[in-house]
Amino acid sequence: MPREDRATWKSNYFMKIIQLLDDYPKCFVVGADNVGSKQMQQIRMSLRGKAVVLMGKNTMMRKAIRGHLENNPALEKLLPHIRGNVGFVFTKEDLTEIRDMLLANKVPAAARAGAIAPCDVTVPAQNTGLGPEKTSFFQALGITTKISRGTIEILSDVQLIKTGDKVGASEATLLNMLNISPFSFGLVIQQVFDNGSIYNPEVLDITEETLHKRFLEGVRNVASVCLQIGYPTIASVPHSIVNGYKRVLAVAVETDYTFPLAEKVKAFLADPSAFVAAAPVVVETAAPAAAAAPAKEAPKEESEESDEDMGFGLFD
């Protein structure tokens, strides 16, 4: 089959991306740095039937989207995020499920000199199995070691690389010698496009419990502010009523003014012992009962002693 010319290929690509944008209401803008062709093929296979992965040149993707803005103006929100090595993952399924599938397709990778670290790298305390001739190599990296049974032992965990730092040649060599693959590469979700709205992928981690907690925090903040400035709202009115009742009660206690609910408080302040008089009665009644038990056991002890005195032993 003859290979299609470049003009035909571009035309088909534009038609494909426009059709995907029309057919799928949701998509991820994903970064594809350090993702090889074999890994990309595995990702496509794992998403088959649930999502479609589309990669391409940024200029072509922008051109296709700009040409389709008349039919779907909301697509303009995607344009600022098409930069770097990015692509799209289109889906009609639950976004969290597709996100988890992308994360599951990350593969471990060794550290390479010159690469930017996507995460912190810590070398754990361990016996490296390396000979003493490598001691100077560890010292150059500031790693405390000792010789144990003819091999180098790292005494404590060491943070070797920080997120965003460039991996040096020495760090990469050490990690390779220790057979540590600190990084994992795959499609990284940069933005989420959902029915015309675009937002950060961290929003996918928000649960109903999180929303409920944040809502209650907001209600408490509103109530606090409204109470301070004296502005009544649904959130602050219950607190205002309680505070008002406390003030009226305080006035009633200090004056001759009274009302049914205040009378009980006044009675308590006048004679607090009247409200706790029943408590000692329980203790007092319980004490004689406890004392009566030994009294009943006393005759039994006397009878046992008398049996022994009479000589009725066990072997008689």
Curated annotation (Swiss-Prot):
Phosphorylated. InterPro entries: Ribosomal_protein_uL10, Ribosomal_uL10, Ribosomal_uL10-like_insert, Ribosomal_uL10-like_insert_sf, Ribosomal_uL10-like_sf, uL10_eukaryotes. One of its GO terms (cellular component) is cytosolic large ribosomal subunit. The keyword Lyase does not apply. GO terms for biological process: cytoplasmic translation; ribosome biogenesis. It is found in: Nucleus; Cytoplasm. Keywords: Cytoplasm, Nucleus, Phosphoprotein, Ribonucleoprotein, Ribosomal protein. Pfam families: Ribosomal_60s, Ribosomal_L10, RL10P_insert. SUPFAM superfamilies: Ribosomal protein L10-like (SSF160369). Disulfide bonds: none annotated. Ribosomal protein P0 is the functional equivalent of E.coli protein L10. P0 forms a pentameric complex by interaction with dimers of P1 and P2. This is Large ribosomal subunit protein uL10. It comes from Gallus gallus. The gene is RPLP0.
